[in-house]
A protein has these predicted regions:
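Non-catalytic connector elements of ABC transporters
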Residues: 3-5, 9-129
Length: 129
């Protein structure tokens, strides 16, 4: 399946590991916290991957502007520009106000759950976990 890829950084803030994606920090889940403790190689630049269906609209999320929206039955496919990056978001139509986001040139905010993110080494492109 399609995936959105973001330049990101893994770092430690306090006693927790976070992935910083598009300027927003995402605290990693416990299994990845443990794996990173063993690796002991942060901060490090990475690539974060998120599938379009794992992205949700969120009032406190990352800013984006809708370029194109496609109503596909029970889903709305949003093609957005976020800080110069093209991102595809697929959201159930039952979860959103269609008038607020359907169409072009509409501002939206999006986010994702860290447990649904994939992390890749920036140089080798191999999965980190």
């Amino acid at each position: 399946p399609q995936m959105n890829f973001f330049d990101a950084t893994l770092s430690k803030k306090g006693d927790k590991y976070v992935a910083t994606v598009q300027g927003k920090d995402f605290e990693l889940p416990a299994d990845k916290q443990e794996a990173l403790k063993k690796m002991d190689k942060v901060p490090v630049d990475i690539i974060a991957g998120v599938r379009p269906v794992h992205i949700h609209l969120s009032q406190d999320g990352i800013d984006a502007m809708v370029d194109v929206s496609e109503l596909m039955g029970s889903e709305l496919h949003l093609h957005v520009n976020s800080n110069g990056k093209d991102v595809v978001i697929v959201v159930p139509t039952t979860d959103i106000d269609l008038d607020a986001v359907h169409g072009s040139h509409k501002p939206v905010k999006y986010s994702f759950k860290p447990e649904l993110m994939h992390f890749f080494d920036k140089e080798t492109e191999k999965n980190l976990f």
